[in-house]
Amino acid sequence: MDMENLTWLHGKPTASGILKANPEDFVVVEDLGFEPDGEGEHLLVRIRKNGCNTQFVADYLARFAKLHPRLVSYAGLKDRHAVTEQWFCLHLPGKEAPDLATFELEGCEVLEAVRHKRKLRIGSLKGNAFTLVLRHITDRQDVEQRLQQIAAQGVPNYFGSQRFGRGGNNLVQARLWANNEIRVKERSKRSFYLSASRSAMFNLISSYRLAQQLSTTVLEGDALQLSGRGSWFVAQADELAALQQRVTAGELNITAPLPGDSELGTHGEALAFEQACLAEQTELLSLIKRERVEGSRRAVLLKPQNMISNWWDDVTLELSFWLPAGSFATSVVREIMNQDRADDTDIIE
């Protein structure tokens, strides 16, 4: 998907700069949202890694602990071209924990290990704390103004280009699969292609809402989400004024669909709007229904938490913030500056 075609909330930036001049410029620390139990048949291992992707480390841990690879899990993928602190889970029923003091893998450091009663599954993560360094910024004044706007109004909650694969290949393959031009047997590829399809449709609807000044305007039949929650409800016509006040106050978020094999979830005016946005996506919608993917919804806008900016000099900015799981730091950066080098294809947040 071409991110250049998506609408900006604060207008296209005038400043340009570089993200990820080196891995240390992109630091991610997982926030599980809970404290490990301290007992149980699972061992949670927190590792700081640089230059290693998540699955590679998981497979290495399995070999080190003499476990089947399926017995090592994690909450989410992280970029190999960054410094990341991530939790891995080893299933050790009735077994002693391996001696992690002898664990050696270039670019990796074991920070702690603690027992836990439950398996760490994909998505069982509250969020991620990011510390980024943006370099060679051309317009400090514009960036500072945008940081104020982002703190007050947020950014579009777009899925980043990395969700669609290098050069958007996951979406290309999804369309070929949808048209029965290729067969996709590998489970991981099926998952990537379906995820890219749903993410692209979410981005499309969100972009249309922004373009029509509807990102914070409640339509009759909109699906609204309590801030910080996953559940949502439908806006009734006789409640629009009160609901609009709550959206304006930041208590509620307007959502867009990640389409599945069921209805979109909206009604009336909002449903008609979403259907119009997806009118040319029939092949992807058919694929999603054929594969019986469960639908969900996601907030159109995202407000970074605990955002702190620190200028090292007039052209170098250190920026830290927290995002809920599934949201992309690159979508925040997109509202701040244009990237001179679009080196984000491997960032998985």
UniProtKB/Swiss-Prot annotation:
Binding site for substrate: 26, 128, 328
EC number: 5.4.99.27
EC class (word): isomerase
GO cellular component: cytosol
Metal-binding keyword on record: no
GO biological process: pseudouridine synthesis; tRNA pseudouridine synthesis
Name of the protein this chain belongs to: tRNA pseudouridine synthase D
